[in-house]
């Protein structure tokens, strides 16, 4: 995940401090496949970070642990409490795949983009790793997002690549890498790119966010 400096400050001050799980980036370089190693754009803040990178599961674990300690928070398994909804004047659903959303918000808009995002983490020789890199390749955008001085997250979005083999993705990463001395490319995970929205966000006492 990427988070801007202002949003990070808000999160730390108003929700919970997450400084221990972020990696600060001071620069973004943008390249084009046609111009080889010539920069199209670059954004830089030499004194402070432009934004930060963090792992989704680490953020989830911190929030989950904090909520469980909160005396005002209670976790309920709705599969075990069939009639619990009747006890509330307002019910808010924040999960598009939850039983509440599926039952009370049936009019939905799903758009598919015929693209898949392929993600992995590369392990490489230690460097000062505070610059994110985006390359607009002929196959789609490829992002190198540092998460430590010797590890970098990769996100490669490729059109019509549902059946693209992991070894092919790894070969493309090697082809476009001009910065890191890669020691290992970890397992590649693939996700279909699509957007989901509701036609209505309220239904009687039920709200969706």
Where are these regions (language model features)?
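A structural signal for short hydrophobic beta-strand segments in well-ordered beta-sheet cores
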Residues: 30, 144-146, 201
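Conserved N-terminal helical subregion
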Residues: 13, 22-105, 110-118
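FAD-binding beta-loop-beta segment adjacent to the flavin cofactor pocket
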Residues: 192-208
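Short hydrophobic/glycine-rich mini-motifs in sensory/regulatory modules
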Residues: 52, 149-152, 205
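Short gly/ser/thr-rich secondary-structure transition/capping motifs
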Residues: 72-78, 187-196
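N-terminal glycine-rich dinucleotide-binding loop that anchors FAD/FMN and/or NAD(P) in oxidoreductases
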Residues: 1-22
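Conserved FAD-binding catalytic core of PHBH/FMO-like flavoproteins
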Residues: 96-193
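Short beta-strand to alpha-helix junction loop
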Residues: 2-5, 44-65, 161-167, 193, ...
């Amino acid at each position: 995940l990427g988070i801007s400096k202002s949003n990070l400050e808000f999160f730390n001050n108003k929700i919970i401090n997450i400084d221990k799980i972020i990696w600060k980036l001071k620069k973004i370089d943008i390249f084009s496949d046609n111009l080889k190693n010539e920069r199209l754009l670059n954004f830089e803040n030499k004194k402070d970070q432009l934004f930060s990178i963090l792992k989704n599961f680490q953020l989830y674990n911190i929030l989950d642990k904090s909520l469980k300690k909160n005396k005002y928070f209670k976790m309920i398994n709705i599969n075990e409490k069939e009639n619990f909804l009747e006890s509330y004047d307002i019910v808010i659903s924040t999960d598009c795949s939850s039983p509440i959303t599926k039952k009370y918000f049936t009019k939905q808009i799903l758009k598919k983009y015929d693209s898949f995002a392929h993600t992995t983490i590369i392990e490489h020789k230690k460097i000062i790793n505070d610059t994110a890199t985006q390359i607009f390749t002929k196959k789609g955008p490829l992002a190198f997002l540092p998460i430590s001085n010797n590890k970098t997250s990769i996100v490669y979005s490729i059109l019509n690549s549902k059946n693209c083999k992991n070894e092919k993705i790894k070969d493309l990463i090697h082809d476009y890498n001009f910065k890191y001395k890669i020691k290992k490319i970890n397992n590649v995970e693939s996700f279909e790119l699509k957007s989901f929205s509701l036609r209505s966000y309220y239904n009687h006492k039920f709200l969706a966010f």
